Design a protein with these regions (language model features):
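Short, amphipathic, aromatic/basic-enriched membrane-interface segments that mark the entry/exit
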Residues: 1-4, 20-25, 47-55, 72-77, ...
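Membrane-interfacial segments
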Residues: 25-26, 71-79, 99-104, 141-153
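Structural signature of hydrophobic alpha-helical transmembrane segments
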Residues: 19-33, 68-86
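Canonical alpha-helical transmembrane segments
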Residues: 37-53, 65
Length: 160
């Protein structure tokens, strides 16, 4: 089995499990899949990628709340919301100069999840973070399976 097939197998199994966990815990399954996606898309892997993805997802949640709360200060002035969105989007990109915030798509995923979750960060954050852990488990269990499979195929048969 190649690496892609191994990752596909573990991702399929754990995706089904995630669906059940999300429903059981009252979480947003779609937001969890954004967390999974963030880990898979992050250029860094392992624990470093997990940490960077988590930091960027959480920063996106915060930035979305800044836009939502800031726009609500003067709801009759629509342009304020547009200007805030532009400024915050700029800052979301600029923050990437810091290593822990260097995965820009993760920041936007966190913000999008917060907008879609209507600003309910107490529901969005655990959904994203648990989904992120599932993404880590999906990819790394697939890599483990591929390495184990490769190792078992490379061991020569011993005859008696």
């Amino acid at each position: 089995m190649n690496i892609l097939l191994c990752i596909a197998i573990t991702t399929g199994i754990l995706s089904g499990l995630w669906g059940w966990v999300a429903v059981s815990l009252g979480l947003l399954s779609w937001a969890g899949f954004l967390g999974c996606t963030a880990y898979f898309a992050c250029p860094q892997g392992g624990l470093k990628g997990l940490f960077i993805s988590g930091c960027t997802l959480l920063s996106g949640v915060i930035w979305a709340l800044v836009i939502m709360k800031g726009s609500a200060l003067a709801p009759h002035v629509e342009i304020l919301g547009y200007v805030m969105t532009g400024i915050v989007a700029f800052l979301m990109c600029v923050q990437a100069k810091h290593l822990l915030l260097s995965f820009v798509p993760g920041t936007f995923m966190g913000a999008c999840a917060t907008f879609a979750g209507q600003g309910d960060w107490k529901l969005v954050v655990p959904s994203l973070m648990l989904g992120l852990l599932f993404g880590y488990a999906m990819k790394n269990s697939g890599l483990w399976l591929a390495a184990r499979r490769e190792k078992s195929q490379s061991v020569p048969a011993v005859s008696k």
